[in-house]
Amino acid sequence: MGTVEKSSNNDASVTDDIRSAEYYHGMVPRQDAEGFLKREGDFLVRKTEQMPGKVVLAMSVRVTDELCRHFMLNMDPTSNKFYFEHTHQESTISELINWHMTTKTPISAASGAKIRRPMERSPWLINHDSIVANKKLGEGAFGDVFIAELDQGGKQEVAVKTMRAEATREARLRFMKEARLMRKYQHKHVVKLIGVAIHEHPLMIVMEYCPNGSLLSHLKKNKVSLIEKLRFTTEAADGIAYLERSKCIHRDIAARNCLLSAKNELKISDFGMSDNKDEIKDETLEKVPIKWLAPETMQEKVYTHKTDIWTFGVLVWEIYSDGAEPYPGLTKIQTRAKIVVNDYRMKMPDGTHPTVADVVTGTCWQKNPEKRSTMDSIHKKLREFYESKK
């Protein structure tokens, strides 16, 4: 029998036999768990927070095409045996699961839920012992960011975002939502998700490492040529156009959130505020970068794919101004007033290619969102112009 980490109220916690089981998915959220279970009888075991600070084990089962059920695993404090809802008991969790599978006995009489196929962990669910943190890069919204070495049959350098152990359940769900979104995206100008480590704390998002750092830092530290600025602009448009086609509203497009690969190729990163929706309402607008917001976001607290196009225009201004802060000399409050009340637009920096300036001022910064073009058409125009200049 594996070692039991006991928890109160007869709830079972992780045992050694479960930790190594292929159907154990760690702290995968309910929404992700249900997405993994495709056919009736598919099941997995996961950790879940029953109440603040109390993490227990649960089994998720696909009961019908439309319905998944979730069952707590319990331990009898007298016999030290495991059971579901006061039914059959076994000495280990794996033996209990095997009994229900082989006898085809429902997990509970009321649900009728039978388990048939264990859902093995996906390749992108990474074991913590495969990751060795090397150097701290900085701090993110949820925790620290590191350069690390990932060993999965071959070593590679990766970037790892961590989640503080003391983070709230809501913060953990946001963290996992970011990973879930990134998992969908495969594009040369979008940072690639390699996987997540969620069996224990700290939770980790493992991504491709971009050794040349942020675009903002590169612009500030180096003398960047006009043709390279045009390339950055075109690559950013390519990545954002892909996200638009993927129905992703990024909400935080800025030079600080663009990373550079070893070949200095631009990649869109940081999906902490993103979502797959046509419209997002944010009633608070807390901790948002005011100087990058579209007028309708400032006034109506709404984000759409068209607000990302406005923000792309601000990113282009950053690129051609060598990483200067937008609306120089203005506070956030002054910026908001000038845009909303006075319909103010920044002048594009000296040296900006006229074609690029026309895209920004004539398309991206249209007051009426419906008059802003699509990112696909913006990228097409910029790509053709860049090709003519190479």
Curated annotation (Swiss-Prot):
Residue ranges annotated for the SH2 domain, each copy included: 23-119
Biological process according to GO: canonical Wnt signaling pathway; cell differentiation; cell surface receptor protein tyrosine kinase signaling pathway; cell-cell adhesion; embryonic body morphogenesis; negative regulation of canonical Wnt signaling pathway; negative regulation of cell division; positive regulation of cell population proliferation
UniProt keywords, alphabetically: ATP-binding, Cell junction, Cell membrane, Cytoplasm, Kinase, Manganese, Membrane, Metal-binding, Nucleotide-binding, Nucleus, SH2 domain, Transferase, Tyrosine-protein kinase
UniProt cofactor(s): Mn(2+)
Domain of life of the source: Eukaryota
Job of this protein: Non-receptor tyrosine-protein kinase which plays a role in morphogenesis by regulating the epidermal enclosure of the embryo, independently of its kinase activity. Prevents hyperactivation of the Wnt signaling pathway during endoderm development, probably by preventing hmp-2 nuclear translocation.
Protein name listed in UniProt: Fer-related kinase 1
